[in-house]
Structures are given as C-alpha cells and as structure tokens.
C-alpha cells in the first residue's frame, strides 16, 4: 500500500514538472515569435523597435506565480530573446545584454506588482491599475531602457537618447496594452472559446 501511495505521489510530481516545463516552453516560443516579428517589422532605422509587446507574456507569466518559480521561465525567455536578437536584430554579442535587459524588465514589473499588496493582478480597483501602470509601464521599461539603449548605441553607433525614448515608448505601450488581457486569461477570468463555468464557481489559478 505504501509503495502504491509513493508511486502515485511521484506520478503527480512528474505531471507537475511536465506541466511547468510545457508552460515554460510555450512562453519561450511565444516570446521568440513576437520578438522576432517586432524586430523585423517595426525596427525602421536599425535601432530599437518601435513596437514591443513581447515582454507582456513574460510579465504576466511571472506576475501570477511565486517568485521562487521564476528562474526557469526567465532563463528560457532570455534564450528566446537572445535567439531573436541574433537572427533578426543586431547580432549575438549584443543579444546577450539585450536579453538581460528585457528579462529584467519583465521580472521587475512583476515583482513590483506582486509586492504592491493584495493580489493586484486582478485589476479589481484603481489602485491595482495604478500600480500596474507604474510598474510595467513606467519604472521597468525606463530602467531596462538604460541598458538596452546603451547596447544599441554601442553596436549601431547611434545616439543613446533617441533609442532610449523609442525603447521606453515601445516597451511601455506594448506591455500596458497586452498584459492586462493575458493576466485575466491566466487567472481564468476570461475564457477562451464558448465554455462557461456554472454559476457560483470560482476559477483557481495553478501556481505551477
């Protein structure tokens, strides 16, 4: 009996690990596709892209999960970011610090939102919206842009501030416009398709 219970527990743990791995892989793939499209389609002068919604999936993914589970998704996204920059951006060497800046931006925004109080990812009031805009739309892209614009300026011989302004605007607007819907979907408040929940039930978000 004890062996059966132990085996069942191990199977459950394996399912959780596989689930986490699959979700992380999907995050990395989605980031790579969005980032690649942004670089190819909205990078007009060889500098920073003018539209950047790619950070939003990472931000939303981290914001609804405990910080102790962030390392895997951050590493996977960093690899995806480096690959996109290497293939379609300003090269593999510049892609290393750019991926650090982008992943740090998503993590910082999510950390501020999680530390801001009681479940601010639900957007149930003006305070949660204000903290979200402050974290993901102002502080995180402004700070990440310092490194990002510096790397771009160094490798393209362009001016720093125009690239910082383009980075800040693109990352801020991209995350603000996309992340709220992603957060609601991840929390189960928006259903994909026609499936409906019975009245009186609440969706619970797994943190794995």
What is each PLM-predicted segment?
Residues 132, 161-174:
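Short aromatic-rich membrane-water interface segments that cap or initiate transmembrane helices
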């Amino acid at each position: 009996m004890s062996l059966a219970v132990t085996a069942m527990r191990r199977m459950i743990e394996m399912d959780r690990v596989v689930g986490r791995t699959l979700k992380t892989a999907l995050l990395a793939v989605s980031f790579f596709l969005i980032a690649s499209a942004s670089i190819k389609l909205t990078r007009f002068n060889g500098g920073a892209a003018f539209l950047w919604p790619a950070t939003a999936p990472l931000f939303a993914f981290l914001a609804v999960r405990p910080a102790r589970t962030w390392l895997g998704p951050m590493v996977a996204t960093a690899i995806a970011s480096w690959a996109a920059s290497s293939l379609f951006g300003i090269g593999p060497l510049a892609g290393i610090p750019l991926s650090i800046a982008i992943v740090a931006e998503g993590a910082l925004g999510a950390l501020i939102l999680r530390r801001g109080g009681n479940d601010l990812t639900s957007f149930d009031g003006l305070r949660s919206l204000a903290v979200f805009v402050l974290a993901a739309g102002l502080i995180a892209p402004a700070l990440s842009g310092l490194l990002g614009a510096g790397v771009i300026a160094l490798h393209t011989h362009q001016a720093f501030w125009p690239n910082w302004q383009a980075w800040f605007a693109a990352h801020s607007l991209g995350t603000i416009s996309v992340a709220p819907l992603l957060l609601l979907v991840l929390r189960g408040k928006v259903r994909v398709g026609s499936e409906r929940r019975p009245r009186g039930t609440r969706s619970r978000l797994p943190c794995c």
